[in-house]
């Protein structure tokens, strides 16, 4: 089972789901709430798959969206998951946002395709634009850029090819 990093734990930002994860010894760090009051958590890459399965078992049966971004030039890449508890006749389903930070030198995160099938195209887009490798994804390949494209266009350190170089390539 995972361990809780108690030194980085801020009780002021800890929500109900963070308390549940702590009770069940899942490693995470609360990051507060967004403008709608949705709890935001940080989970380490190596802990993400087991935490994702636990969240699914807890009732977060819908991956509303997955996206990724480059936090800072030369810094971490972040994969963001917005999860929702979909229940019958639920006017305001519970939501959570989970962020997984990875190094740009080894950007590997376990795929949650086997937990939420809707992750298929979303993880592929994050791979295509930022180069995050989703381990265990059955179809991980470029989805927007040509297979021959070099580099990851949404990284802040990406150097845009000269237009004429691209034109001459065809």
UniProtKB/Swiss-Prot annotation:
Tell me the GO molecular function terms: NADH dehydrogenase (ubiquinone) activity; quinone binding
What start and end residues bound the annotated signal peptide?
none
Return the EC number.
7.1.1.-
- Main localization is plastid
Q: How would you summarize the oligomeric state and partners of this protein?
A: NDH is composed of at least 16 different subunits, 5 of which are encoded in the nucleus.
The family this protein is said to belong to:
Belongs to the complex I 30 kDa subunit family.
What is this protein's name?
NAD(P)H-quinone oxidoreductase subunit J, chloroplastic
Source species of the chain: Adiantum capillus-veneris
Q: Which gene encodes it?
A: ndhJ
């Amino acid at each position: 089972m995972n361990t809780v990093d108690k030194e980085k734990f801020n009780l002021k930002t800890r929500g109900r789901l963070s308390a549940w994860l702590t009770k069940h010894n899942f490693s995470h760090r609360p990051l507060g709430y967004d403008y709608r009051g949705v709890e935001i958590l940080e989970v380490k890459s190596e802990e993400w798959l087991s935490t994702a399965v636990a969240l699914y078992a807890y009732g977060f049966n819908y991956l509303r969206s997955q996206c990724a971004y480059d936090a800072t030039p030369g810094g971490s890449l972040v994969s963001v998951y917005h999860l929702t508890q979909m229940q019958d006749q639920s006017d305001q389903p519970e939501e959570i946002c989970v962020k997984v930070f990875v190094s740009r030198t080894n950007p590997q995160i376990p795929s949650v395709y086997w937990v939420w099938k809707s992750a298929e195209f979303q993880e592929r887009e994050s791979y295509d634009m930022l180069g995050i490798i989703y381990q265990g994804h059955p179809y991980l390949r470029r989805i927007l850029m040509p297979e021959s494209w070099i580099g990851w266009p949404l990284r802040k350190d990406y150097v845009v090819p000269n237009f004429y170089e691209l034109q001459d390539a065809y």
